[in-house]
Amino acid sequence: MPRPKTILWVDDEIESLSAHVLFLEEHGYRVEQAAHGDDAIALLQRQPYGVILLDEQLPGRRGLELVAEVRSIDPAVPVVMVTKSEESGTMHEAIGIQLNDYLVKPVNPRQVLTVVTRLLEGDQIRQQRLARDFVGRFRELEQQRRSQLGWREWVDLTVEVAQWEARLGESEEQGLQEALHGFQVSVHDDFARFIESHYPRWLANPRGDRPPLSVDVCGEFLTPLLETHGKALFVVVDCLRLDQWELLKPHVGSLFDIEESYYYSILPSATPFARNAIFSGLLPLEIKAKHPEWWGDRDDESLNAHEEELLTEQLHELVGDAVPVRYEKVATLAEGEALQRRIPGHLSQPGVTALVFNFVDQLTHGRAENAILFEVARNSGALRSVTRTWFEDSALLRALKEAERRRVPVLLTTDHGSIHCHTPATVYAKRDTTANLRYKFGEDLRAQKPSTAVRVEDLRAW
């Protein structure tokens, strides 16, 4: 429920502010006045106000002392300090008790109106602007989707769609969210066809015009940090989506200057293939040829059991010398607490500290098996919200803070994302076909609707 458009202005010289009061009333606000703190408290106990303008110097007690009593009556009411004092100590006190704004007298009526409008109508104004911006941009995005896009243009489109998804998800514009979702369905179909026609060419001609792939992450993004700084923190957040990153980015940006780059996951984009490609710099068949004993008839979990060795080998080849690697995988609270104890020692040494965080992957896949997880992360917006809540008190954030304190550069990435599927794709297969939902290996595979799948006949070409 929006706060009322009423203002309580508390000032023992309120008669000198009549022009300000009149100006606010002309713009649709109702202003009530109080000359003393006790009068203000009595008024506040009778009715709620949209915002309180509070003089710092009141008869009997300071305005700052009155704030606690105001908040005990209405904890959510915005309070703006209006004072003659320009002392930094007063300003620091105001910031410390979390006042919503701070104005130094003399103030002109327009200043006061701006602050009040921001506090009482800011959300509504931002929602209206967001809606106008999206409607205007939506037509352009649709035209862009229908054009011949190269891999760079696909990156630009995907990033912008993820940004819109995050922004609209924070709003109450349900109709716009539905329009964006319908657009995303078309984008996913078009991108699948693009990958189907281009991916084999990228593998056949690795020196041609192709995007960075999973196998290029360490060479393009990690080794430059090592060459410049001698050490780096390398973080892989399993199954982190681009829209989730948009919500985490402000937190990371408060610690570091962020430089964003994008790469395409190899196929299949499942963890055993995509993440091993990052740590090894090799495609799956190349890993199998180099380490045949590691990949056999095993479950998916064991296929990622050698990431530390793969990263060590790759860095040796890229740098031309042995690079110390400290590797940890964090999937439980206990592992996160153990990492917190060890991370200062890790980051004090040269080389790479590599961390894999599994929470987002566990949350995403656990929705299908756990009713509670499904309830708290039932859609993309809820999944983003839970991911942000986890991050704000996570071992990952604590590791990033330690890296910032020690001035250790960070490479943070994901191995693959996820898609909330609403329409199932039926695949007919024999019993011995792989159970993974991202891909199927087997004989006589057939999709009920061919357009829902990418059919691969020559595995070596993919």
Placement of each model-derived feature along the sequence:
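Two-component/phosphorelay signaling modules centered on CheY-like receiver
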Residues: 14-32
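Acidic catalytic/metal-coordinating carboxylates
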Residues: 36, 62-65
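Short amphipathic alpha-helix used as the core "switch/output" element in two-component signaling
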Residues: 42, 64-75
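Active-site beta3 strand of CheY-like receiver
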Residues: 47-53, 58
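Feature captures the catalytic ectodomains and active-site-proximal regions of enzymes
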Residues: 57, 92, 122, 126-462
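Alpha4 helix (beta4-alpha4-beta5 surface) of REC/receiver domains from two-component response regulators
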Residues: 65, 86-101
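C-terminal output helix
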Residues: 89, 107-116
